[in-house]
Amino acid sequence: MQEALNQKIDAFVAANKEQILKDIATLVSINSVEGAPEEGAPYGAGPRAALDKTLELAAGMGLATRNCENHIGYAELAGADAEKYLATICHVDVVPEGNGWTEDPFKMEIRDGWMIGRGVADDKGPMVATLYALKFLKEEGVSLRYPIRALVGDNEETHMHDVDYYLANYPAPVFCFTPDAEFPVCNGEKGHFDGKLVSPVCNGVIKDFVGGVATTAVPDRASALVATDITKLRNAPNITLEPEGNGVRIRGWGKSGHAAMPEGTVNAIGLVVNYLLDNDLCNDAERAYLEAVKKLHDSTAGVGLGIDCADGPFGPLTIIGGKMSMVDGRMVQTMDSRYPTCTDGDTIAKQIRTAIGTGAELTDVGSAKPFYIEADTPAIKACIDTYNEVTGENATPFTMGGGTYARHFPYAVSFGPEHSDMVLPEFGGPMHGANEAAPIDKLLEALKIYIIALLRLEEIDF
């Protein structure tokens, strides 16, 4: 019976491959970065357009669809149970494209078996895969015990207000998985702490300081405009100098990456901060602020701020500074930390305030606790067993620093579609980075995994 099912799924995937890629390209072509709220578009015109198009694609597959007051939507297959339902949830909003692209970020390209474009991995490719999982079940005429909803989020990258709205106005699923991380199964996510380091109005040497495109990404570019003579400045690695007006524009060139996985990145804001300090391009108030910010950038483990810690399930705390800006004469540096169970948001805030002293003010603090679900629960076992059978691996669940929709639901995990051992091609980049890339064969394999997992979840007594 299992072999016959495998053959049916393989035939379905092969027959639909080209259309799957076309549908992903359609969603990628929509710039769905969060924008200013509009009438009927609480998260901006781009996310609303992506939501509408996704529901249109689902309807074209014969799935029932619903737009939940423009905050979120879903495609659905009916089931016998009128009270309980299963769900998947993906998102069709994306982070800003940022710098460094060699391709148009909103025109999907295919090269050597890889898709390239903003959202191919996070999370438009997986969104399309979940729709096709429901399409398979519909075409096969499977009688479902529990209805299945493929939820379509459009505010994941910033605030997740979409899922907050949904859970406040609609019943929660008995189990939900989100294809927005790595395989096999992530059954725990670190806590999330964010805030801003704000300077006083310094009226000093630094006239402008900008860097980064998202608070959740390590910036690869940053620059400061300072009132000085370029002939007095020295060269430094990853720093360029150019005259601008009556001063000098100092640019830092780093390497971008996701805030939850900062290993191997180079923060361009930190490069500029160090250059300003090393060359005394600041007055006393600016120096005090930059010294505070330097403590943030000195270590992605939080050593400089005195917040470093680690535990067994989650490993070490991470922290990055994603964006720098000048607002009303004040420098503003954002922070994004993913923390394990050995600390909490209040403790982190207290430790940071101690570390920065009077040089900066910590503002706009927010935090969310870690969450963890035991790996031996029936739904998680169904997911992990399916993954191992399809791939031939003997993988076990893991925890991570990334934050997904899963933490918002009573019983949920993230489930693929990426792989921790995936090696990006020279022309490809990571989620949130330039030239975001995803392998076609692995996404199609994920589609097979999702179909079988949903069938197994249907058999569980929730």
Regions found by a protein language model. Give the residues of each.
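Acidic/His- and Gly-rich active-site-bordering loop/insert found
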Residues: 2-118, 142-144
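Zn-dependent metallopeptidase/amidohydrolase metal-coordination segment
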Residues: 12, 385-386, 390-460
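Active-site metal-coordination/substrate-binding segment of hydrolases
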Residues: 83-152, 158, 170-171, 428-442
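Acidic, glycine-rich active-site loops and adjacent beta-strand->loop/helix elements
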Residues: 92-94, 148-159, 179-184, 213, ...
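Acidic-glycine-rich active-site phosphate/pyrophosphate-binding loop
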Residues: 95-110, 192-193, 198-199, 242-252, ...
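Short amphipathic alpha-helical face segments that pack within enzyme cores
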Residues: 125-136, 270-274, 445-452
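Midchain, well-structured core segments that form catalytic/ion-binding scaffolds
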Residues: 157, 164-341
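Substrate-recognition/cap regions that form aromatic- and gly/pro-loop-enriched pockets
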Residues: 326, 331-402
